[in-house]
């Protein structure tokens, strides 16, 4: 945790913020000293390609998946990075993205837009603010679409990856990118040429990727060999392409080679443990070069700040706000620096290189030894690459031959398909088809076009670099790219009636796994990939089973499918005893390919976990009504009902296990609710009857019988849950504080642990609701009641010692304070403002320092 606690000055936050001395080396440098820290923020696409959604990943616990976890540990903390005073109170919140040079991969940005729009908007705003500060040059740079190793891609895919990355960037940041971060910094001459052709001005590489350099305009004898990372990173270089026409100006890409030692220290040593160390380490890189401008810059995974190294986003925040300016280092970004100081040297690159592989790009195509620290081989890498290359080429042939019937230019259409990927509304799809079709298309032909384009999208995704990066093919990253391959194969079959899976599996057999239970890539595919396939029928079964417990609107969104109820009134349902039978007709339509399926379902719930759900195409209204009559006619005999269901629909059926995991878990909790209620009543009676016995055991320091201890723990936790439910339903019940305190006291007396997860979630919701009311109050008088409620809830937090999400509360509070503080000062409304200030103290915010800084900014 970075705070002023690290320093000797104890004169208050503002006194400290101006107290840190600039490192000695930096003081020797004049105005021409600049610094750029680049963060490569990226997560691989993790969505199930059939659902367009990430399924729960237990390894990310307590979060649902790894994106959620890294969002909480890194992306959000960097958008709201704290600077703390000597008491650990917040004195300032910094948006680190306003000062970092950064790239966020398109697949990550797409996920953020859907799952945390607040952080997403902070990132976009950071780029706008940095552009205003730096003459129109924003901090954000682009990235090829899904992190494909560009030197290993064919020419067509290389350009598509860059074009999709640029289009995604333009859509989000509303400007063209100046630079592009290359996946794994992998580069070769064709990649340089592709970047130049697509209008990219610069890239960032490792110093080990340079071969030789010389002053521009020198003769061939003046080349300096720098192949052992000796290149000077404090200036940019120009990489010229071979001239096709000597009479034309040479084309070029500008290159920044980041400082290797500093970048390694940031990732693997303690240089980011405090801003003093970070600023000092950067200042050490300055050279005594007279008036020549110098750029000190480093690059590392953005996840270093908060995910790999907890709380280190605070180190950045303090360095950006105070440390670097005081050290005489001007914070800039690559585009701005390049506009002010274009290269005076040129460079030649090594033939094929990357920043994380000493063997060129071997890590992504052969068993080169990288990632072999665990003792596992990577002999699977080359066969996997070969199998996917084969599949890519076959998919390309299918695509070109089939889509040419419908579209004027298949490959131009593929490049433009990014517009649909970014906006799948019917209006955008129609706009795309209008621009690229060669003739009027029927509905089934539109579906085939979209299938073929989605086939191509998945063929891109199956080359995501993470699939090769680690030691074993059966890891989630390897399985993920095989799932994209499976989806592409399925779409090819749907659109062109071709079977590519058989030969693909034969090729995967040549990819040996390190795990005996799999043996090879083909078996991994069978066990880990085929099980993830979600057909439209499974979506219908998912809907049918869940409809027994949840009410759906006439049209519902089930992941990437729209499910429309086609029955005239409502689905037909009957219950006898504990058995329930439901039948219905659905139109299941893919939001991605627009394909639709008219299906009927029959679902029989025989109590508990016993579900039988059958699906078939709609057989016509008369046949559908006959099925209803026969099935409902035998519901009073459960064995006959189950037999009749299979007789009408066929032997294939779906069970509770067929549900998508997130919803399955929800229904499992519902099914156990009544059982838990019965157990709670039983435990409560045992506890009440034996309360004094329990106290006697505790008083005499004897081991409490586990049965009695369990009864006490269950009862107290149930009381806590009921009290929190009541408080959330009726926030006026402040008298519950005494009852909550009694629960806590009894738990302490009896040595019981209270389970606070649900209570904490409830308190977080209540706190945000009241802060929202304060934020949107038009006048200070309207904040009085929400402030009283917040005071009550914070008392509950203290009683329970609940680990609330204080960060979110602080962020909302500071927005409230900045909005109302000036108005309160002008109107003299001291009572409401005093309440607001008191709340800030309870949320560990140094309100006086925040107010003082805002007043200074206004004045």
Locations of regions flagged by a protein language model:
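Active-site and substrate-binding clefts of carbohydrate-active enzymes
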Residues: 12-85, 106-107, 223-265, 269-549, ...
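Short, well-structured secondary-structure segments
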Residues: 34-39, 43-156, 160-161, 174, ...
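Extended, Lys/Arg-enriched charged tracts that mediate electrostatic binding to polyanionic substrates
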Residues: 78-79, 94-95, 104, 112-116, ...
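Acidic, His- and aromatic-enriched active-site or binding-groove loops in soluble protein domains
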Residues: 121-139, 163, 175, 196-245, ...
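CE4/NodB-like, metal-dependent polysaccharide N-deacetylase domain
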Residues: 158-182, 245-248, 283-297
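Beta-rich nucleic-acid/ligand-interaction surfaces
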Residues: 184-191, 210-214, 339-342
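Extended alpha-helical scaffold segments
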Residues: 698-859
